[in-house]
A protein has these predicted regions:
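P-loop/Walker-type NTP enzyme "switch/lid" segment
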Residues: 1-40, 145-147
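Inter-motif core of Ras-like GTPase G domains
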Residues: 33-41, 54-76
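G-domain G4 guanine-recognition motif of GTPases
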Residues: 72-73, 97-111, 134-141, 156
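Conserved C-terminal guanine-recognition region of P-loop GTPase G domains, centered on the G4
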Residues: 78-97
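Conserved phosphate-handling catalytic cores of large alpha/beta enzymes
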Residues: 89, 105, 119
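Short helix-capping segments at alpha-helix termini
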Residues: 92-93, 121-128
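Beta-strand-loop-alpha "switch" segments that mediate conformational coupling across diverse proteins
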Residues: 125-152, 164-166
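NTP-binding/hydrolysis catalytic cores, primarily Walker-type P-loop NTPases
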Residues: 150-203
């Protein structure tokens, strides 16, 4: 585990989870024990699934308590986001989704992107989703990547940094708009669902 000065620790997962179903029961048990420890020691445990969702990652996503869906304004990205939410919703219609538009060139573009996804989910799946907002296209992100540091740390006054902090604060205080959108209590559903997926995959 790598620690950062900002209090956000991370584990580089690589592609190890792709062979999850091939693990022995003992190895999987150690994973569950480690995740239980993380749940006790951290306020939030985030899984960055990235682009290019495959079957095993979709199964993992269905076990999570809450899902933040990040899309750009590009039609292919919007379609991928909708397809993923539809797949998960049909497996578990109690899942909560939060929408975030990334790399928006204007405020209007970001709003239109999240609105399209929200409307389509409500119209075709009768599923309510929550809009977190949008992050603007900003050159400081690439500069921060080159320096291997957080853009919120290197460029705290950049538009994207201010927007990111606002969105995170809204989520941490359990408010999106004027509605409370997620529980302050810790859920144990994730681990029980993950165990179920592992057991099913080995049948």
């Amino acid at each position: 585990m790598f620690e950062t000065a900002e209090g956000v620790n991370y584990i580089s997962g690589g592609s190890g989870m792709a062979s999850l179903m091939d693990w022995s029961t003992a190895t999987f048990g150690r994973l569950i024990a480690a995740l239980e420890t993380l749940q006790k020691n951290y306020d939030f445990v985030l899984f960055d699934m990235g682009a290019g969702i495959v079957d095993w990652s979709l199964d993992l996503l269905t076990s999570l308590d809450e899902i933040i869906v990040i899309s750009t304004a590009e039609p292919t990205s919007i379609m991928d986001a909708y397809s993923m939410m539809k797949f998960i919703h049909l497996k578990d219609n109690s899942k909560k989704f939060y929408l975030l538009c990334n790399r928006a060139f204007t405020i209007e573009e970001g709003q239109e992107t999240t609105k399209r996804l929200k409307v389509v989910m409500e119209r075709f799946l009768e599923k309510e989703v929550f809009v977190l907002g949008s992050l603007p296209e900003d050159v400081v992100v690439r500069q921060a990547v080159r320096q291997q540091s957080l853009f919120t740390t290197l460029y705290p006054d950049a538009p994207i940094s201010k927007t990111m902090k606002k969105i995170v604060q809204q989520f941490l205080t359990h408010q999106v708009g004027i509605e409370e959108v997620h529980s302050t209590t810790q859920s144990n559903k994730f681990l029980s669902k993950l165990k179920g997926i592992f057991s099913k995959g080995r049948e």
